[in-house]
Amino acid sequence: MNKIEMKSNKFKNVISDVNEKLHNYKWEESYKIIINALSENPDAPEPHNLLGLWNEFNKNYDLARKHYRAAYALDPTYKPASINLERVCTMFSSRNVPADFGEVFEKSTKDNTNLKNYNKEKEMKNNDGQ
């Protein structure tokens, strides 16, 4: 196992642990885990996203936005940060969007075949209707 895989597995464990603690309202325990993860790797978006969630759940929305922005700035492809940032910055329309803990791990290469096929079918229908 290389260093990147080890780091990825470690963050999966941290995310899972913090997720469980936040859902059980264990604020101090979750905060300590997040700060520890942040101090070990300040350039990773995951701890900033989790700290944003922690602040949001504690109704400190300004600090939550700052950490979501930090996570997004560190890795613009990290979707949980952009989802959470959009939700917390949008006044009304995104309030029903659930918090994204980053617990769903995506593959780095995405298969857009279904989307391409859908777009082709849609385009063909539009051309037939004209």
Q: Where does each model-flagged region fall?
A:
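TPR-adjacent "capping" and linker segments in tetratricopeptide-repeat scaffold/adaptor proteins
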Residues: 1-13, 39, 95-96, 100
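Helix-start (N-cap) detector for alpha-helical repeat units in TPR-like alpha-solenoids
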Residues: 10-11, 45-46, 79-80
